[in-house]
Amino acid sequence: MFSKEESTSLRKEFWTCFGKSFPRKWVLYNTKIKGLSFKFVANRKNAMICLDIEHSDEMVNKILFDKISSLKTILKEDYVSEVIFDDSYRLENEKIIHRIYINHKDKFSIYNKNTWNSCYNFYVEVMPKFELFFLEYKDIINCI
């Protein structure tokens, strides 16, 4: 196992290497829709790309999730076929959110540098497709 300091250092190195290797401005938190954000996730067990719905008003969360869910067929057929819709995703801190995500299929651990390149390639291949879907359907999603 790694000490807390080693763990922190490896995480920082992972994200720094990603940013330097693939300098690009991602949408991420800049969706311009309150409570809706894209995220790259990497931890000791897996990596994924997420669209998280975490508005302070649960009714808004449900509406946003339902609107994106109504576009599920388009998202799967035209952008990212492996997408998973979860209306009650439990985060590590036990918070329940609505999450739409794509898992990295290869074995991955943020603590194993040999798995990093595969994850980076997954991120740069899949996130642009996910973002493109969002940007093309943003007006429908944001119609609250």
Where do the PLM segments sit?
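Charged, terminal alpha-helix-loop-beta segments
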Residues: M1-I144
